Amino acid sequence: DLNVRFLNKDEYERWDSIVAALPSASIFDESKWLAAVADVMGCDIRILGVFDNDRLIGGAPLNISNKFGMPTATGIPLTPTNSCIIEPLETIFSSKATNYLLKITDAIGRFLQSNYDYAVVANHPFISDIRSFNWLGWRTQVLYTYHVDLAKADFSALPKERRKLIRKAENSGVIIERSDDFSAAHNLLAKTFRRKD
């Protein structure tokens, strides 16, 4: 049986190592991002962990609050998903990998149902099997997103209006670059919300 509980802060490094190993994960799944959003937004963000014995194998970040006296576990502000994160399973058998995924998502779903009156988990597009949530009676909705490799993208195939917006951004000096500098994102968020005070 799997054990499900919230991680202690000293376990965040292990969480981050699982996130780093996943091609589907992003900065929005990292504990530093979650801590920065919690700080800027003044909310209680926790990472739910799923353990096989003492080994962390998955989980999900959640915004914990009380709404109208009801405990809730929902998505993270300023963050596109609060996806289930699943440690990769080394196997050549797709059925074994599917069962592993379903076992972990079932544990997450059951924990949330047992402890919260309302819960939201918005998975990455790479979590393509949400049957565990369906079987538990959750209201589920599959939404679609597209991933475009910009280096290989054929911009001539884009609609005219989209090409116009891209050219306008380029002419305005907008550039996109990969960065591991977390402080840049944190500073931008802090400035954004400071202006609204």
Which residues does each PLM region occupy?
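Amide-forming acyltransferase catalytic core, primarily the GNAT-like/NAT-type
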Residues: 2-81
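Acyltransferase donor/substrate-recognition loop-hinge adjacent to the catalytic core
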Residues: 1-12, 132-197
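A structural signal for short, well-ordered beta-strand segments and their strand-loop junctions
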Residues: 49, 58-61, 118-123, 175-178
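Acyl-donor binding region in acyl/amide transferases
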Residues: 67-140
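Short loop segments at secondary-structure junctions
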Residues: 53-54, 89, 149-153
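Non-transmembrane alpha-helical segments in soluble domains
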Residues: 16-19, 109, 186, 190
